[in-house]
Amino acid sequence: MARYIGPKCKLARREGTDLFLKSGVRAIESKCNIEAAPGIHGQRRGRQSDYGTQLREKQKVRRIYGVLERQFSGYYKEAAGKKGATGENLLQLLECRLDNVVYRMGFGSTRAESRQLVSHKSVSVNGKTVNVPSYQVRAGDVVAIREKAKNQLRIVQALDLCAQRGRVEWVEVDTEKKSGVFKNVPARSDLSADINESLIVELYSK
């Protein structure tokens, strides 16, 4: 499946919630009516079946983190094979992706932009260049912007945006050096309450 490059508002309307795919502090423009489904007429949503609700939750999480279908299924299988709650394990695997950590540290204004920074070899982990967005960052790893990219305007602007929206507690960042430490894997209580991972577990358990 190809990566979606169309309007971000359309995805937000499809899922009925802000997916934080836009770069501004206010992610979705006021003209984007997320209460209405995509399309010219923007019909209101009717009652969904249990399966439909579960599927929409999976699609929402997949789009938030910018993960393709096959990748997401792989993460679920890995999460199910770990000790503990499968849903929490799944979210933690997604949070530990390098592109997501770069976003959480504020080096990219969106996860898509952060993924591009990684792919373009602008990011290092523990001093070594890593260009794989799905690379799993571990607690204690040092993630930094490489010297060649430190003066990019988009990185400076992204750090300013992050300062406005606030940075998560499980990363520590030196904005001058453009380097940060991934202090720990976040607990479920640290992550968004707008995600209902139990619906995803129910979907894959069928």
UniProtKB/Swiss-Prot annotation:
Keywords: Ribonucleoprotein, Ribosomal protein, RNA-binding, rRNA-binding. One of its GO terms (biological process) is translation. SMART domains: Ribosomal_S4, S4. Disulfide bonds: none annotated. InterPro entries: Ribosomal_uS4, Ribosomal_uS4_bac-type, Ribosomal_uS4_CS, Ribosomal_uS4_N, S4_RNA-bd, S4_RNA-bd_sf. Coiled coil: none annotated. Residues 96-156 form the S4 RNA-binding domain. Pfam families: Ribosomal_S4, S4. GO terms for cellular component: small ribosomal subunit. The keyword Glycosyltransferase does not apply. It comes from the Bacteria. GO terms for molecular function: rRNA binding; structural constituent of ribosome. NCBIfam families: PRK05327.1, rpsD_bact. HAMAP family: Ribosomal_uS4_B. One of the primary rRNA binding proteins, it binds directly to 16S rRNA where it nucleates assembly of the body of the 30S subunit. With S5 and S12 plays an important role in translational accuracy. Part of the 30S ribosomal subunit. Contacts protein S5. The interaction surface between S4 and S5 is involved in control of translational fidelity. Belongs to the universal ribosomal protein uS4 family. This is Small ribosomal subunit protein uS4. The gene is rpsD.
